[in-house]
Amino acid sequence: MWLRPSFQLPVLLGLFGGALLAAGAGAPLIHIPIFGSLSYLRHPADFTACSIGEIVILAAAGLSVVFALLKRPMLLWLTGTVALAQLVGTLVIFEHDAAAVVAKADQPNLVDPLMMWAGSALQHARFEWGIAVVAVGAVMLLAAALCAWRDASKA
C-alpha cells in the first residue's frame, strides 16, 4: 500500500470519521422557524433525544479516535453503529414528538395559543446539514472497520 504502515486506510478513516462525529455534534440538525436550529450541543432541556445523543455522539467520536490511534479498527464497528443508531433514533423521536404536537394543535376546540403556535412552527420544521455530517462520520467508521475486516480476512 502506498501509505506508511502506521497510517493505513482503516486508521485514517477512523480518525476522520471520529472528527466528523465530533464536528457533527455541534452542527445544526433541525431548524424550527422562530425557535432556531437544534443540535446535539444546543437544544432545549426537555428534548431528551438530544440530551442523551450529545453524550452518545461525543463518546463515540472520542472512542473512535482512540481506537484508530491504538490501531484497533475492528472496534469501530461498535462506535459507527452506535452513532448511526443514535442519529436515526433522534430523528424518529423528533418526528414522533412533532407529529403529536401538531395533532394536538389541530384539534378544533383548542384554545391554547402556545400550543397553536408550536404546532404551526413544527409544521414548517426542516432537517439541516448536520445530519449529513454525523451520518458521513458514522459511515466512515463503518468503512474503516470493513476495510480492517477485509484486510484481516485476506491474511
Where are these regions (language model features)?
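Compact integral membrane and secretory-pathway proteins
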Residues: M1-A155
